Amino acid sequence: MKRDKENQTLTRVEMEIMNRLWAKESNSASVRELLAEYPDPKPAYTTLGTYMKILTEKGFVKPEKREDDGKTFFFRPLITQNEYRKIVMKDVKNTLFGGSMRSLVNFFAKEEKIPDDEIQELLSLIKE
């Protein structure tokens, strides 16, 4: 059952998988192709396959078969990385900062020690 992505979050492992898919030039990959990118010790093929099933059920990826390889499923993201960032940041702003952009920015300004050049760049972006 596919659910609304705006109400879904990705686990750390799911996020790692999605980042690998988003980085693909072909915008899709099989479990075997994804597995080849992992450093040793690699997760089990079945473990990665289970995560792909979960991501499919959550509505983040779609399994497809290519014409040139009718046996293997290739998984294509159904949401862009930027779209997911927007969803997550909106949720963080609303749930942790009471919907206040000012509180969110204030938190990062105080906690992250933003370099002066980045502050100037941020101010320029705000003025646009």
Regions found by a protein language model. Give the residues of each.
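Short, cationic-aromatic polyanion-contact patches
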Residues: 10-13, 66-87
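A short, conserved structural fragment
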Residues: 56-66
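Short alpha-helical segments that sit at the start of domains
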Residues: 1-20, 80-83, 128
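Amphipathic alpha-helical dimerization/coiled-coil segments
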Residues: 84-128
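Short helix-coil junctions and helix-kink-helix linkers
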Residues: 36-45
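Short, hydrophobic-biased segments on the C-terminal half of alpha helices
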Residues: 49-53
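Short helix-capping/hinge SLiMs at alpha-helix to coil transitions
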Residues: 22-27, 41
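Short acidic, hydrophobic short linear motifs in intrinsically disordered regions
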Residues: 27-37
